[in-house]
């Protein structure tokens, strides 16, 4: 079949006939994901996630399929939706659905469907019964967590969803109001048993920290993003490979010789700059932080403002996690055929709403020409959403093994040791677990560790088996 499955089924995918293709790619990915496979082997007998009901909101890719099957192998019950309307790989969703996991993810789904699916991943049991909702959330960007918090507030006071400031907020607020009209205590009940959330990305961590600081975070949280084996690998090395993959698949453009502007020089920006420089682009960087700006300059990149670069650069990449990084006045000033894309989590880094009034011409899915009144056109990729997942398939399996090993370990930590973590607080995994994730991946790349002697360990004041660095160490 090639149509979306019937709405009454406990899933929403594009095409179940893609399951065999998805399964073949999952098998390939498993060979490149040694961390997850080692965790399965270590914990399968103990079933540490038995009894866990995990609501998952994370890009429904082949690599995520391996994560889902790892969580299930450790005993968890899982319901899953994508955290981005363009990031789903439909054959991955089909393979997971064919295995019996409720999946709600279709590449190119509408925002209305997106929020409907995000609601549906909380429906574990019958209304008013124990186990009605999840007891764990695995989040990427914080939308599932946001939904529970905003929904509970709206149950008490609908005015909190009365004044949307964007089209996405309008759709989200409408979905919340409709749910409350249908079931006035749905959000309170669905979140009643949640032990905690593990958060994948920088943007979601910002949301968690804000709620924790205000005293409004309802449950425990582990910040997976700031594990070294996530942020210094997924964010940097993953983006270093997947950014250019997305740009190339979308445009077939020659990178060499072009001026490429990277907005932001954090871990993601560093990886993007390295990738573009490796293909011999002239890389320019914008930054607000003097330390990051100096780092970029010391790497040989020209540090400029967006106003300076707008009419000069050929390729623009936003990586900041902030909003309005590329605004209307910048796009008006750009060259004809400038390429504009984003690799930050949300679509508000580029002010796409400000150019919706102009004529759009779809070149192919997720590649649009925006034609200005003077006839100039820019090429906008993935409508300002994640270019590496909208126009390609995201990060390679190996680096996602490192990220998802952290996610799995974090889920085990929160679920099995809830008393060790205080509700309303945000934690990072202990360094010993961070080092464990790294160890699980060394053999695959042929790396051999040097072992300290007793005397050496005593001299520098560490245990022979680690951890080897202070928590304040900057890798």
Swiss-Prot record:
E.C. number: 3.13.2.1
Binding-site residues for substrate, renumbered to this chain: 61, 140, 200, 230, 234
Pfam families: AdoHcyase (PF05221), AdoHcyase_NAD (PF00670)
Pathway in which this enzyme or protein is active: Amino-acid biosynthesis; L-homocysteine biosynthesis; L-homocysteine from S-adenosyl-L-homocysteine: step 1/1
GO molecular function per UniProt: adenosylhomocysteinase activity
Reaction(s) the record says it catalyses: S-adenosyl-L-homocysteine + H2O = L-homocysteine + adenosine
Protein residues bound to NAD(+): 201-203, 235, 264-269, 287, 322, 343-345, 388
GO cellular component, one term: cytosol
InterPro entries: Adenosylhomocyst_ase-like_sf (IPR042172), Adenosylhomocysteinase-like (IPR000043), Ado_hCys_hydrolase_NAD-bd (IPR015878), NAD(P)-bd_dom_sf (IPR036291), S-Ado-L-homoCys_hydrolase_CS (IPR020082)
Subcellular location: Cytoplasm
Cofactor requirements of the protein: NAD(+)
Domain of life (superkingdom): Bacteria
Note accompanying the cofactor annotation: Binds 1 NAD(+) per subunit.
Primary location class: cytoplasm
Gene Ontology terms describing biological process: L-homocysteine biosynthetic process; one-carbon metabolic process; S-adenosylmethionine cycle
Sorted UniProt keywords: Cytoplasm, Hydrolase, NAD, One-carbon metabolism
Function description: May play a key role in the regulation of the intracellular concentration of adenosylhomocysteine.
NCBIfam families: ahcY, PRK05476.2-3
PANTHER family (UniProt xref): ADENOSYLHOMOCYSTEINASE
Record-stated family: Belongs to the adenosylhomocysteinase family.
Protein name per UniProt: Adenosylhomocysteinase
Protein source organism: Paracidovorax citrulli (strain AAC00-1) (Acidovorax citrulli)
Lineage of origin: Bacteria, Pseudomonadati, Pseudomonadota, Betaproteobacteria, Burkholderiales
Gene name of the encoded protein: ahcY
